[in-house]
C-alpha cells in the first residue's frame, strides 16, 4: 500500500465517522516543564496511559515551578508569587526536619554509638575520624592499655551491628515523612509525565484542548502535540484540532468567534 493509498483510505474512514481502526495506532509523548495543575486536567482524558514523576519517595531540595504569563508580566504579582513558592519550600524543609527528628527519637534510631558517629546522616567518614583520634596527629599515640583496645573493639562491633539497621530505618522513615510533607507543594509545582494515547483519543483530546477556551497551559501542550502528530501521520491528523476546524463551534454564546483563524491555523 502506497502512502497515497493509505491517505485516501484513512480519509474515507474518517469521512464516514468510522474511527475505530485508528485506535490501533498509538503515540507516546515525554513532557516536562509543566505544572501539576496541567496534569490534573490531563488525566481526565481516561483512555490513555500516564507515568508521572513521583513526589512520594524523593525529597526535593528546591522544587521548580511554572509561572503563569499573566503573573510573570506583572512585576508586583511576580514578586509575590515567587515569595509564595519560596515560603512553600521553606515550610516543606522545616516540617520535614521536625518530623524526621521526632520519628528518629521515637524509633530509637540514634543509639549509643550511632548518635555519636552521625549528627544527621550515617556517614562512615566520621567513624574513620574517631579512629584517627587514637593514632593520628603530629605525635601519634599508641593505645595505652587493653581497656582502650576493648573500647575500640566494642565500638566497631556496635557500629557494624547498628549502622545497617539504622540506615534501613532511617530510609523508611524518610519515605514516610515525605509522603506527608509533599501535601505542602502547590499546583504550580513543575513535573514530568509520559503520555501514551491512541490516535482516536488524541483527536478527541485536540477537539477539547486546542480550543481557545481551554486553559492556557494545557492548550499550549495540546497545540504542540497536534503539530508533532501532523508531521508524522498527516493522513490521520490532517484535520485535527478544535471542534470548529471541521464543523460548527459547540461553545455557543461562549465561542471565541475565530472559526476562520482556527481553520487556517490547524488545517493542513
Which ranges hold each PLM region?
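Family-specific signature for flavin-dependent thymidylate synthase
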Residues: 1-268
Amino acid at each position: 500500500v502506497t502512502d497515497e493509498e493509505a491517505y485516501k483510505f484513512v480519509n474515507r474512514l474518517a469521512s464516514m465517522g468510522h474511527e475505530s481502526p485508528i485506535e490501533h495506532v498509538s503515540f507516546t509523548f515525554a513532557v516536562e516543564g509543566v505544572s501539576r495543575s496541567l496534569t490534573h486536567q490531563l488525566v481526565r482524558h481516561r483512555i490513555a496511559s500516564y507515568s508521572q514523576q513521583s513526589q512520594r519517595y524523593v525529597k526535593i531540595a528546591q522544587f521548580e515551578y511554572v509561572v503563569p504569563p499573566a503573573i510573570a508580566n506583572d512585576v508586583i504579582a511576580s514578586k509575590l508569587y515567587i515569595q509564595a513558592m519560596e515560603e512553600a519550600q521553606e515550610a516543606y524543609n522545616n516540617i520535614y526536619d521536625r518530623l524526621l527528628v521526632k520519628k528518629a527519637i521515637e524509633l530509637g534510631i540514634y543509639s549509643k554509638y550511632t548518635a555519636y558517629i552521625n549528627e544527621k546522616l550515617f556517614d562512615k567518614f566520621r567513624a574513620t575520624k574517631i579512629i584517627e583520634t587514637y593514632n593520628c596527629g603530629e605525635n601519634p599515640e599508641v593505645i595505652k592499655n587493653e581497656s582502650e583496645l576493648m573500647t575500640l573493639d566494642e565500638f566497631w562491633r556496635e557500629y557494624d551491628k547498628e549502622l545497617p539497621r539504622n540506615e534501613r530505618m532511617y530510609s523508611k522513615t524518610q519515605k514516610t515523612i515525605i509522603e506527608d510533607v509533599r501535601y505542602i507543594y502547590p499546583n504550580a509545582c513543575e513535573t514530568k509525565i509520559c503520555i501514551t494515547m491512541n490516535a482516536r483519543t488524541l483527536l478527541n483530546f485536540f477537539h477539547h484542548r486546542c480550543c481557545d477556551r481551554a486553559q492556557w497551559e494545557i492548550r499550549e501542550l495540546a497545540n504542540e502535540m497536534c503539530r508533532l502528530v501532523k508531521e508524522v501521520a498527516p493522513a490521520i491528523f490532517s484535520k485535527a484540532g478544535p471542534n470548529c476546524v471541521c464543523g460548527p463551534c459547540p461553545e455557543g454564546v461562549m465561542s471565541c468567534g475565530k472559526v476562520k483563524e482556527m481553520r487556517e491555523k490547524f488545517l493542513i
